């Protein structure tokens, strides 16, 4: 109940970003609904999305944050994803047990299970739009990940990755360049 009240009381910018996240998550699950609240409820039933929702409300207005704190007292969060940083709308965390901590990330970031996006010292990654970080991949340090990038499962990224690249391995290396139609199929 408090989760929905927090959404209703949130500022318009927070609602817009949550809406982008909900759209992305429902599209991924092939669910279609016209009702904004019904769509939000569908997403809140998923543990993976609920963690993203709580992350978004951390930056909401005081009333929404207070409602989420009350919810946490009544029923503590089962959070298996740590999310920090400035991340634009369309965030999709495919499974739990991930750490998402870029300095900045663009729209439509998709993170697979067990992926880690973290800092090295005080240097945080900066991630572009339409990036997929697959299962158990690691992105660390002050690297810059371009737009339309796929980072393969188990890859370790410690150097910058240009736009429209597919990278794999440890250390990650570019194996091919992709076009938009390739990318849309995977995202």
Feature names for model-found ranges:
Residues 14, 79-80, 138, 177:
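Residue-identity detector for threonine
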Residues 5-9, 18, 22-27, 40, ...:
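Residue-level signal for functionally critical sites in structured catalytic/ligand-binding pockets
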Residues 165-186:
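Conserved beta-strand-loop-alpha-helix hinge in the C-terminal portion
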Residues 1-77, 184-187:
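Terminal amphipathic alpha-helical/low-complexity segments used for targeting or macromolecular assembly
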Residues 77, 83-84, 88-95, 100-102, ...:
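Left-handed beta-helix
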Residues 13, 21, 29, 33-35, ...:
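Generic serine detector
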Residues 7, 56-60, 67-70, 108-125, ...:
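A signal for specific C-terminal beta-sheet/loop modules enriched in small/flexible residues
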């Amino acid at each position: 109940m408090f989760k929905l009240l927090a959404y209703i009381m949130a500022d318009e910018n927070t609602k817009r970003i949550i809406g982008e996240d909900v759209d992305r998550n429902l599209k991924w699950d092939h669910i279609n609904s016209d009702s904004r609240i019904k769509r939000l409820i569908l997403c809140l039933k998923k543990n993976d999305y609920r963690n993203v929702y709580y992350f978004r409300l951390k930056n909401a207005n005081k009333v929404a944050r207070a409602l989420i704190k009350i919810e946490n007292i009544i029923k503590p969060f089962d959070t298996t994803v740590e999310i920090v940083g400035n991340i634009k709308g369309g965030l999709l965390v495919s499974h739990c047990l991930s750490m998402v901590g870029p300095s900045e990330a663009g729209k439509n970031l998709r993170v697979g299970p067990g992926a880690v996006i973290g800092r090295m010292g005080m240097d945080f990654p900066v991630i572009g739009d339409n990036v997929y970080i697959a299962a158990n991949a690691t992105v660390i340090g002050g690297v810059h990940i371009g737009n339309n990038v796929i980072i393969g499962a188990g890859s370790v990224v410690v150097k910058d990755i240009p736009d429209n690249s597919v990278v794999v391995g440890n250390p990650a290396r570019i194996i091919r360049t992709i076009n938009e139609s390739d990318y849309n199929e995977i995202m």
